[in-house]
Amino acid sequence: MDNITFKIFNSTAALPLQWDHVAQQNVFLQTAYLSVLERSAPINMQCFYIGIFENSELIGVSLAQYLNLNILESFGERDKRFKTIIRNYIFKNFASHTLFLGNNMITGQNGYIFSKEIDFECISEILRKSADEIIGYFKQQGIAIHLVSFKDFYENCASAFKNQAFSKVYEFKTQPNMVFELPASWQTKEDYYTAFSTLLP
């Protein structure tokens, strides 16, 4: 790992020219997608783009996202019950500043990609160190990161990471339910479109 380094970028305009060559196997890490994400990101999200270098050659790219959940309206003003006030206080002070290494907007292994084989020890160390650097960036701004999530690894990657720099990281698994049951009344795609423009009773 001595000759492996990383650099964190705050803007897609600053990304190295070789970025898309490295990310050619993952459209969600290419500059076209990242530029759209940067321009259309929710107001509570900030993206960081991590270039991973061997000597001076770009060999890997990764995405990190900071979410400030205090800005979400759903956690804003609600009723004034004591339980709600306590919950909001705890949330605001202990869980509202979240850093994702990976893409919080989509599911799947879209957090990083390499143009060459890199061992899991090196990858896990780079991800941990880049998270630490981003946490330090926010600390300088007076923002404490409450939660760090390393998101969406393949099963074999997650297992290998647990044996490396992620050995003390709490692991949880969830799989979105992609099952969508169609009402019997939908016989054509027009029925589907109509359902979106029809008011429910």
What are these regions (language model features)?
Residues M1-P201:
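N-acyltransferase acceptor-side catalytic subdomain
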